Amino acid sequence: DAASLYFADGKIVSVGEPPTDFSADTRIIDAEGGWVTPGIIDVHSHLGVYPSPGVDAHSDGNEATAPVTAEVWAEHSVWPQDPGFGRALAGGITAMQILPGSANLFGGRGVTLKNVASVTYQGMKFPDAPYGLKMACGENPKRVYGRKGSGPSTRMGNIAGYRAAWIKATDYRDEHAKYEALSDEERKEAKKPMRDLELETLAGVLDGDIIIHMHCYRADEMLSLIHI
């Protein structure tokens, strides 16, 4: 109570008694009776990929064409002019992880953005933030693909899909690691492994460079995923 908060160059300089050496053009805000909080970080957001108000032209959050679409990146769907960004900022959200939707077992890469005005998503990207990988279990994938008459259509189908994808990713990572370990002379005789964008993302998870963000409903499903 009855304290002053002094900012300079976007950082908190002092809390308590106001400094006496601030410049004459310093902006003074009377916030008596209000609250000052740190910026809120939203770790699960679809702003920009599902703008509001929603229209089909800008609804780009789910690549619902296959259960495994780890090759897609949410940042390539972000519409920086989504009016929702401004409303979120008014509510105190200053950074957010933008994720694909939850239709697929593996929905694709998520990206961390600063909630700043920008013409492009590149101008919003949070420096050095790791990518996330959106995954979903339970009702969503089995509903989406069960209705299409394809798999998965059950929870056991979901689990089988995860296992198969991680097995492929492990083999892919091992194959590339084996090639990279070869000497220059040995590489002349070896066949360079093909690059696969889907498996490259999954291998990034196995290497610890990409962080899983899992959409789950039930505790037992969460335990199943931990077992995998």
Task: Indicate where each model-derived feature is located.
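Glycine-rich nucleotide phosphate-binding loop and flanking beta-alpha elements
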Residues: 13, 19-20, 47, 104, ...
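Glycine-rich loops and low-complexity Gly/Arg-rich segments
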Residues: 12-14, 53-55, 65-67, 120-124, ...
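Conserved small/polar residues in nucleotide/adenosyl-binding loops
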Residues: 226-228
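Polyanionic/metal-chelating signatures
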Residues: 84, 89-223
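Histidine-rich, glycine-flanked metal-binding segment
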Residues: 1-37, 54
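Metal-associated gating/positioning segment near the N- to mid-region
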Residues: 31-100, 105
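A short, polar/charged loop/turn motif at coil->beta-strand junctions and beta-hairpin connectors
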Residues: 22-23, 66-68, 206-208
